[in-house]
Amino acid sequence: MKLKILAAVLYLLISPTVLKAQSKIPPIDIYTLDGERVNATTINNDSMPMILVFFKTYDNDCRKNLFSISEAHENFLAERNIKVVAICVDATGKTDHIKPFVLGNDLDVEVFIDKNGDLKRRMGIPDSPYTIIYDQDMNVYCQYNGYCSGIEEMICQKAVECLNKILK
């Protein structure tokens, strides 16, 4: 019985979420690590799949999710031109801890800061970590809420599946 409950919980954590985030990235201002304001709609991957990861620097599951996807990008996704973009959503007020976090952990992804949580709210992101895979037209291909060990393999598999649809 316990095994069935555990399996159900794991399935809910790693299966594409029933909650649907907004399909397109809305025109909300976000910030680079250097504090420059950019419009979120400028985030794209030149007609290739892209992975968007929402994270908080202080949350253990967010960090594990971000680190594993960053490593997958470095070892596998980058050579397939699949871009990974991370959006930090724990910056209500101060942001000076985010750049040292990114540089100190040698993250191989582009990172932006959602200072007031406007992008997260507008996209309907329920909580972090939250991962969205976009297709070549920046439509949501699939999305995942939460983290569990090995999720990066499933995300890589879905991203490559999306890429293969483009290449056909």
Label each PLM-derived region with a short phrase.
Residues 1-24:
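Bacterial Sec-dependent N-terminal signal peptides
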Residues 19-42:
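N-terminal "domain-start" segment that seeds a small globular fold
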Residues 26, 50, 128-130:
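Short loop/turn microsegments at loop-to-beta-strand junctions
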Residues 40-63, 69:
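Short active-site neighborhood of thiol/selenol oxidoreductases, capturing the structured segment around
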Residues 63-104, 116-121:
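Structural microenvironment flanking redox-active thiols in thiol-disulfide oxidoreductases
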Residues 101-134:
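Short, internal strand/loop/helix patches
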Residues 133-168:
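Thiol-/selenol-based redox modules, centered on thioredoxin-like
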